[in-house]
Design a protein with these regions (language model features):
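Bacterial Sec signal peptide processing site at the extreme N-terminus
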Residues: 11-48
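Blade/loop signatures of beta-propeller domains
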Residues: 33-49, 53-89
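Short loop/turn segments that connect beta-strands within beta-propeller blades
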Residues: 127-131, 172-176, 212-216, 258-261, ...
């Protein structure tokens, strides 16, 4: 009973204190000084004004147009395209997986035919009127399930094909029949360049390989420094006189002798690049114009490099 009385008295005391406004026990207040506020994230303003309105750019009247066929410089020149499509046709085929990263391209022939492939690795050739000339597929069922990505180049007689499974082969460009087929130890991830009776391609080990068009035998190979983590970006190549130039997975630009594969020069383009960052690097195709090589990347870098010495 005594405990209940004590509890009741304590409760009355606390309650009476909470109602007290004169003693200052509960009413003591403190005024806060006005503090300055600063925005951490400032909204970006879109500029809608034109810069350098007085600058005039004069373009040549004559367009310089280089052929798309077996273009070993990746330089198509200044083309005038009206944007008009007079004839449009459609052909349905299986959607290509990972299309954006691997950037597969069409292959064109001298008689305006177009060559492409579908998600099963079938190669399809159309004439200039969109009529199907031939369709061929050399892959086995287990390979088709892997959705091979093909890369093409042709010299008017042979269609050279490499893929991301490590296969490389030659197709008769007129009939679509297989001439020879071989297997590389590593998948390919580059453009193909053809010169005379040879073709050149880079695989995922950053090895540039030179093969015979006639039978697919390897003539020479040239290795460069590589990264542990590989980018999905396709490697670009150009041919200049006696050398072939490409960029490896580290972002280095590499030039080798086109006859022997011996290193001529190697120029790094990335400073303190960690292996984990090489996966995100994406380079444009390298373009050769006279003695200069031009290319850019997704790190907001643009390069002009002398092809003679790097």
């Amino acid at each position: 009973m005594k405990n209940k009385i004590k509890f009741f008295l304590i409760l009355i005391f606390v309650y009476s204190c909470s109602l007290d406004t004169k003693s200052g026990f509960w009413t003591k207040t403190e005024k806060l000084n006005n503090t300055k506020t600063k925005k951490v994230f400032v909204e970006k303003k879109v500029l809608d004004q034109e810069f350098n309105t007085q600058i005039k750019i004069k373009l040549k009247n004559k367009n310089v147009k280089n052929s798309f066929l077996n273009n070993n410089s990746n330089n198509n020149g200044n083309n005038n395209f009206t944007g008009s499509f007079k004839n449009i046709s459609k052909y349905k085929f299986k959607k290509i997986s990972n299309f954006n990263n691997l950037k597969p391209e069409l292959s064109f022939t001298k008689n305006n035919s177009v060559i492409f492939f579908d998600n099963k690795g079938s190669i399809i050739k159309f004439d200039e009127n969109s009529n199907l000339e031939w369709k061929t597929n050399i892959y086995k069922k287990k390979e088709i399930k892997l959705n091979p990505i093909l890369t093409f180049s042709n010299n008017g007689e042979f269609l050279i094909v490499v893929d991301n499974l490590g296969k490389y082969y030659a197709i008769n460009i007129t009939t679509g029949s297989l001439i020879w087929s071989k297997k590389n130890l590593a998948p390919f991830n580059s453009q193909i360049k053809i010169l005379d009776d040879k073709f050149f391609v880079v695989d995922y080990t950053d090895t540039l390989r030179c093969f015979s068009i006639k039978n697919g035998n390897e003539i020479w190979k040239s290795t460069s420094e590589t990264s542990l983590i590989k980018s999905l970006d396709r490697v670009s190549l150009v041919i200049s006189d006696n050398e072939i130039v490409y960029h490896n997975s580290l972002g280095d630009l590499v030039a080798v002798n086109i006859k022997t594969g011996n290193l001529i020069w190697q120029t790094p383009t990335q400073k303190n690049l960690l292996n984990k960052n090489t996966f995100t690097i994406k380079n444009s195709d390298i373009v050769l114009d006279n003695n200069s090589i031009f290319f850019s990347n997704n790190e907001n870098n643009f390069y002009s490099i002398d092809v003679r010495n790097g």
